[in-house]
Amino acid sequence: MFIRPPVLVLIGLSAAILFIAGCKKEQRSGVPYTQVDIQFNVNNPAYVDLQVPSGWIYITGGSRGIIVYRKTMDEFVAMDRHCPYRPEDGCQVFVDDTQVTVRDTICCGSAFLIVDGSVTGQPAATGLQQYNTTFNGTTLRIYN
């Protein structure tokens, strides 16, 4: 079978466009991409709530702020507070009185687990945007 040169050009251009489109920064769940690279010493008195497992704090950063949760002595989770349900509304989630659930009852009406940001109450279909974390025993780094 003989393929005409213009068809080969179209195939090549299509492949190039798909490759380039695949290289742009990802916006998970429609939450705006915000560069995050934060480091702090968890032993600082300002972060006393992070010194034991199940502790959490709010910090500035990300799209609508960040929740930092200590799962174990060596493992942390950092999640954006921007609700992924109708992200254009800019709803911000809060840790509720149970200390287990993150929710926004006024704006997005969704609920998430504090341990991993997964959805526990609709209408959100995707969990909270998570950031990478590394911990060396004293300094926690949160980044994307």
Residue ranges and their predicted role:
Residues 83, 104-107:
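Short cysteine clusters
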Residues 1, 23, 72-73, 105:
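Charge-rich, low-complexity amphipathic helices
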Residues 25-99, 112-116, 127-144:
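N-terminal pre-ligand scaffold of iron-sulfur
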Residues 120-121:
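Acidic, glycine-rich flexible loop segments
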Residues 1-23:
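Sec-dependent bacterial lipoprotein signal peptides
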Residues 13, 37-40, 107:
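Short, flexible active-site loop motifs that bind/organize anionic cofactors or intermediates
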